[in-house]
Amino acid sequence: FYFSSTKRNGGDRDIYYMDPKNPSAAKMVLQVKGGGWGILDLSKDNSQLLIGEYISANESHIWSLDVASGKLSEVTDRASKGVIQGDAKFGNLTNEIWFLTDKDNEFERLAILDVKTKKVNYLTSKINWNVENFSFSEDKKQLVFITNEAGRNKMYLMNTKDQSYSEVKNIP
């Protein structure tokens, strides 16, 4: 499994791979500078890691690591300052990454990035509150997302094929 740790120097949060049956053989797969790096998702074929770089409460970025080559690539534009881009997950299609962002908006929205075209489709722009997090079903045909609406959390269920969603009512 993959994990992040500051074990190299106590400050920089590098990415490692470890076989749980042989923890002493953990190997670094990405050396970084700074403590705000963390793993977001692993592709279905185990070839790509999505990695988040947390700069501040108002700025974060998403990267992709090719596990075989060790090549780190920008997913979101690192030059975008003051933009939150995080909580990224691979979608069902190999060219899509689902993530949260406040780019060009007051609120964090759920969005899909087409990796090939770099086009972003914002899915929750009609909700004028922050989307706090989201989670796919195991088959990734549905997802739930949580909003914070005036201090109250609301849950929504989305069909990932057509991106339609509705609020889940009467949660105990």
Region locations from a protein language model:
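Blade-terminus and WD-like Trp-Asp/Gly-His loop motifs, strongest in beta-propeller folds
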Residues: 1, 40-48, 87-96, 134-142
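Extracytoplasmic/periplasmic ligand-binding sensor regions of membrane-associated signaling proteins
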Residues: 1-4, 10
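Multi-bladed beta-propeller domains
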Residues: 8-10, 17-38, 54-57, 63-89, ...
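Cationic-aromatic interfacial patches
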Residues: 110
